[in-house]
Amino acid sequence: KRPLFQLGQILSTPGVLEHLDHHGVNAQPFLERHITGDFGDVCADDAKENLFAIEQGFRVLSAYTIAERKVWCITEADRSCTTLLFPEEY
């Protein structure tokens, strides 16, 4: 699958970084899913909103369960950066 948008700079909160490191998980496959339209654990309406956001240049949010924790992947509207964070860190 081809990328649907640019990630920009890839950032992570310290909590997610520690979680990924502790469980030996590479974030790359999740980032690839995010930019190719596999938005993970979001409802159908949110997935449709993401496709609209990609077309119109709005924020894109995916949600993945990584080592039993929900992790959000958010790309800003201006595509300057994509951040991995826990929902409670938003």
Range-by-range predicted roles:
Residues K1-V60:
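Compact soluble domain cores
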Residues E55-Y90:
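Short, compact, well-ordered microdomains
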